[in-house]
């Protein structure tokens, strides 16, 4: 019987080795597998290479992993934001390596790994520092740069629902990099809001087939923290 579910986030990230390359889904906070990241921090793996769209927000999620000094190198598109103080401090101190990749190239390099493509030519980045050391070619009068696929040992992603076979459905913008990362990693670990019985997922709605998923853990959404406003406080 195929059953890819595990009981806890700790069990989901068990066995991740020091020095692993890990893709982490999310576009900012949308689709960020925060509970899996917290479990990874507790698990203790170090010297990691992280692939993500950015380099963390505030001091939670990916930023918490950076702050715990578990990351040696990060591959991303938007490392600096108004609340990227953890990344900024580590990078300026020389404690974190950065490979900057244009967002479209990042998505396609990940997709190429999952599709078995050995590389692709793109005009994005030609003539800039991002193209230094890479093969270039002129095709039909236009200049291109050869980009290589990005493979990973693990992918940590977030989905809305799954069944025990690992079939996934995402919620709106939380989908982002999840599907391509799932196909590009040797081991894909997914946190979901709800695990449903086989047959409950509409086959036409499944985005990531279970063949790309290794482990699934159900994580109930946290209750929102709402502070009473001034008007509410006045009437207490």
Predicted regions mapped to residue ranges:
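Conserved alpha/beta enzyme-core scaffold
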Residues: 1-236
């Amino acid at each position: 019987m195929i059953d890819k579910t595990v009981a806890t986030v700790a069990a989901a990230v068990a066995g991740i080795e020091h020095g692993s390359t890990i893709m982490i889904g999310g576009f900012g906070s949308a689709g960020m597998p925060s509970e899996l990241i917290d479990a990874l921090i507790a698990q203790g793996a170090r010297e990691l290479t992280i692939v993500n769209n950015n380099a963390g927000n505030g001091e939670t999620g990916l930023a918490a992993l950076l702050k715990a000094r578990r990351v040696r190198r990060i591959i991303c598109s938007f490392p600096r934001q108004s609340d990227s103080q953890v990344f900024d401090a580590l990078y300026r101190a020389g404690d974190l390596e950065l490979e900057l990749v244009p967002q479209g190239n990042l998505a396609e390099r990940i997709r190429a790994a999952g599709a078995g493509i050995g590389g692709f030519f793109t005009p994005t980045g030609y003539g800039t520092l991002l193209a230094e050391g890479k093969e270039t070619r002129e095709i039909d009068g236009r200049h291109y740069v050869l980009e290589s696929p990005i493979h990973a040992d693990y992918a940590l992603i977030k989905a809305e629902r799954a069944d025990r076979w690992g079939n996934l459905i995402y919620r709106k913008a939380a989908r982002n990099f999840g599907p391509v990362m799932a196909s590009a990693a040797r081991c894909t670990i997914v946190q979901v809001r709800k695990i449903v019985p086989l047959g409950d997922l509409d086959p036409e709605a499944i985005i990531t087939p279970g063949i790309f998923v290794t482990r699934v853990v159900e994580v109930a959404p946290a209750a929102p923290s709402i502070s009473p406003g001034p008007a509410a406080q006045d009437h207490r």
